[in-house]
């Protein structure tokens, strides 16, 4: 579910998705803003664990370079596992909740392997911004994002069957 929403070509790119970058550049040219992001899961992992949040060209260049280096040093399963264990999903007082396993316990009080599709979609929805999609403060916003995740997931399910 995560890859369907965040990086459908994860297993087919070298850490950077050139087609998505070209699409974002086109969007900038046509609309003066991107319609959606182009960062791969590998780039998100680099950004979340090694770089600052500043939005500069030099930071983006470093992110791309480091993603390419990471992909040349580690296999996709390692990178995906690392992402799933380090992605920020919640804040509980002064304690941050990182990773899907801890997120499942925090939000649903159960191991990740026992989550329903809707519960898993909630965690995937939160990846985009745990504060922006806060389950209590922004319940409607989260519900809309969760529904989008489920729609993408169910479309893929139909294609596979």
Model-inferred region functions:
Residues 46-161:
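Non-catalytic, structured segments within soluble enzyme domains
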Residues 1-42, 82, 93-103:
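Flexible, acidic/glycine-enriched loop-and-adjacent beta/alpha segments
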């Amino acid at each position: 579910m995560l890859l369907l929403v965040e990086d459908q070509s994860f297993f087919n790119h070298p850490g950077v998705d050139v087609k998505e970058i070209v699409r974002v550049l086109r969007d900038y040219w046509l609309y003066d803003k991107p319609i959606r992001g182009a960062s791969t899961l590998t780039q998100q992992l680099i950004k979340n664990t090694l770089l600052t949040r500043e939005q500069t060209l030099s930071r983006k260049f470093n992110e791309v370079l480091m993603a390419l280096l990471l992909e040349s040093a580690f296999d996709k399963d390692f990178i995906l596992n690392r992402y799933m264990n380090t992605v920020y999903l919640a804040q509980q007082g002064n304690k941050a909740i990182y990773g899907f396993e801890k997120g499942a316990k925090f939000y649903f009080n159960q191991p990740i392997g026992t989550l329903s599709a809707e519960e898993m979609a909630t965690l995937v929805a939160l990846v985009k911004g745990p504060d922006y999609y806060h389950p209590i403060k922004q319940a409607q916003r989260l519900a809309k994002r969760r529904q989008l995740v489920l729609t993408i997931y169910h479309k893929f399910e139909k294609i596979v069957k």
